[in-house]
Each structure stands twice: as structure tokens, then as C-alpha cells.
Amino acid sequence: LATSSAASDVYKRQMWLIGVAKEDVTLMGQLLGIKLAASEFIGYIQLSDLKDATNLIHLNYQKSIIIATYMLCGFANFASIGIQIGGIGALEPKQRKNLSKFGFKALIGGTLASLLSATIAGMIIG
């Protein structure tokens, strides 16, 4: 819980930039932090709880739910760096150093791609 709270503080500004309503930026920031630290699967489990309006803590807008769905869709998390180094490195062991060098950049690129898709979906919804 402390990790998701810290992630919320870090990522809530980015959530505002991609078009999330101010009432939902904190929860959306938590979702992005969970996705990056754990995996998109855990993020989707959390999103399923946040979709339920009968819960005390929930997302207030349907647009936020749709943006979250696109934002969580992707393989950009810290575990994926290891998976890519192990998987691709097994095919070409000489390139493991390059893979580890570019792993974090790939994480940032993948996250930005997911956020761009979420932003476009939010723009289309209006």
C-alpha cells in the first residue's frame, strides 16, 4: 500500500496530462505504479475493484476506466526487463550487455506508448 501511495504522488501529474479528471488522478497514478512495479495483470485486478461504484474507493468517471484500460495494456514493467534479457539473451548471448543497457529505455518507451494510446482513447471519448 505504501508503494502504491508513493506511486500515486509521482504519477498523478502524468494522469492529469493525459486527460484524467482531477477526482481520479490519484487512483490512476496508483494503477500506473502498480503496473510498473508488479505487472499489468495485478493492475487489471485493481481496476476491476475500482470500476465497482458500490465500493467506497472507486473511479468516478467512465472515461477514467477506459483510459486505465488502455494505460494498463502493455508489457512495460520491471519484470519484463528480466524476461526480455533472459528470452532474447538466450537467442543471442553476446547481446545480453546491450539488452540490459537498453532495458530501462525500453520500459520508458513501452510506458509512453501505452500512455499515448490511453490519451488518444480519452480524446476520442471526449
Range-by-range predicted roles:
Residues 2, 20-21, 94:
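Short coil/turn linker and secondary-structure boundary residues
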